[in-house]
């Protein structure tokens, strides 16, 4: 049965979608069966994996209770399928408000495909609205990307409070998989200060893997490819493989315990 991991941060530009796409692809390269769910109306994860024409999307999954299997498409990355997003997903925030059990729509929809995959990765919307609450209610854990730049911790308290509320009301089993430092530049004092600050504030919650600023990483989505397909020898590809290995190791330890 798949472990479901949300990738969330309501602050834009922190490497959220980059992480969702490339962690999914790295796990696929490591021969895990992966379903990526694009739950961001901007649909950058979908276009970043070469998805262009779609009939069903996350919107249909949530708003019209479409069967999950109907919404799944193959991607350019080995062992990675996707439920793509569409701008229509914006409307779901409003349309679901009066629905009974509205926070549980994604959890219910994914039950039918959990046995088909090893991991389900959800690229959450850059907000703390109903779609993100759905993702966190469906998830077993959440990865929070944090950029190594000014105001790195801005908004993190709000996200952690949202996670606590979801744990309290909807999903008591939700864990924080880890905080992931992104856009790191070893030449900059600020980057190194952020690494120290995050590690001191959140000991034992931070991934050892740090994602560096990397030109190839930012180029890959415009070609509809993950960094693993676009340039497997780049620093970005190597670091996302390391992150995937770290996630697998953490989960193997959890299973043993």
What are these regions (language model features)?
Residues 1-257:
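P-loop NTP-binding core
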């Amino acid at each position: 049965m798949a472990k479901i991991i949300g990738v969330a941060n309501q602050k834009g530009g922190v490497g959220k979608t980059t992480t969702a796409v490339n962690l999914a692809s790295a796990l696929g390269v490591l021969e895990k069966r992966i379903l990526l769910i694009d739950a961001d109306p901007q649909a950058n994860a979908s276009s970043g994996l070469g998805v262009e024409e779609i009939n069903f999307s996350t919107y249909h999954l949530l708003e019209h209770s479409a069967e999950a299997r109907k919404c799944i498409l193959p991607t350019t990355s080995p062992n990675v399928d996707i439920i793509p997003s569409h701008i229509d997903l914006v409307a779901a925030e409003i349309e679901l408000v009066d629905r009974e059990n509205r926070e549980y729509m994604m959890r219910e929809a994914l039950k039918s495909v959990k046995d088909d995959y090893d991991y389900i990765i959800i690229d959450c919307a850059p907000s703390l609205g109903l779609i993100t609450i759905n993702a966190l209610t469906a998830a077993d854990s959440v990865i929070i990307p944090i950029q190594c730049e000014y105001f790195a911790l801005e908004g993190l308290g709000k996200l952690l409070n949202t996670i606590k509320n979801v744990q309290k009301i909807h999903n008591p089993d939700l864990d924080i998989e880890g905080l992931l430092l992104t856009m790191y530049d070893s030449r900059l004092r600020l980057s190194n200060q952020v690494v120290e600050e995050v590690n001191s504030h959140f000991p034992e919650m931070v991934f050892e893997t740090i994602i560096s600023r990397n030109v190839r990483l930012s180029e890959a989505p415009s070609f509809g490819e993950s960094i693993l397909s676009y340039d497997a020898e780049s620093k970005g590809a190597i670091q996302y493989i390391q992150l995937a290995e770290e996630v697998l190791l953490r989960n193997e330890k959890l299973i043993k315990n």
